[in-house]
Amino acid sequence: MSAILGKKIGMTSLFDENRKAIPCTVIEAGPCFVSQVKTVDKDGYAAYQICFDKKKENRTAKPQLGHFQKSGVEPSYKMSEFRKEIFADELNAGDEVKVSIFKEGDTVKVSGVSKGKGFAGVVKRYHFGGGSKTHGQSDRLRAPGSVGGSSFPSRTFKGQRMAGRKGSDSVTIRGLKVVKVLPESNLLVIKGAVPGPNNSYLEIVTSK
């Protein structure tokens, strides 16, 4: 198994040997660096903390800067932690993780933050059918309807679907195939769509 951090570049199409168009997502994957090695003795579990997308020192908070300097790596915008068993090889602080750890045909799961849609009603957010257009209704077309009876249950249940902020959720899509690996450009081409807008950060992990 393998894992890496990346940034979504955008979508494109590739053609297979049967001249069929395959929708693909291009991801800038790595290079990442190990910023911390967590051990069972010290932290209670074994994991690697890796970082991606370098940033200037004057843009980095002092505590974070000290954390990066301790590992001998440059400050980065994105940090994530992965369990040690995900990686096939033993890693040390400062080691580089490249996109070449993947190969064509690998099955991966991609995690990211979905696009934010802002405040949305129940029709857009949860695909409610809305109220009747006839029988005297005037302003109930996109209304949620009843959210709890008066005599029973005399309350609104927790988790009731209502209007609110849509999107900006942590999303993982599993079962995606690696179509192409371009180590010289640090690019990973994956079949299908992945969460989030362009230039958003992603976690790519090979499936078992």
Swiss-Prot record:
GO BP annotations, alphabetical order: translation
A matching Pfam family: Ribosomal_L3
Signal peptide region: none
Keyword Ribonucleoprotein: yes
Keyword RNA-binding attached: yes
Keywords: Ribonucleoprotein, Ribosomal protein, RNA-binding, rRNA-binding
Region (Disordered): 130-168
GO cellular component: cytosolic large ribosomal subunit
Molecular functions (GO terms): rRNA binding; structural constituent of ribosome
Record-stated family: Belongs to the universal ribosomal protein uL3 family.
Quaternary structure annotation from Swiss-Prot or TrEMBL: Part of the 50S ribosomal subunit. Forms a cluster with proteins L14 and L19.
Primary role: One of the primary rRNA binding proteins, it binds directly near the 3'-end of the 23S rRNA, where it nucleates assembly of the 50S subunit.
Protein name from the UniProt record: Large ribosomal subunit protein uL3
Organism name: Chloroherpeton thalassium (strain ATCC 35110 / GB-78)
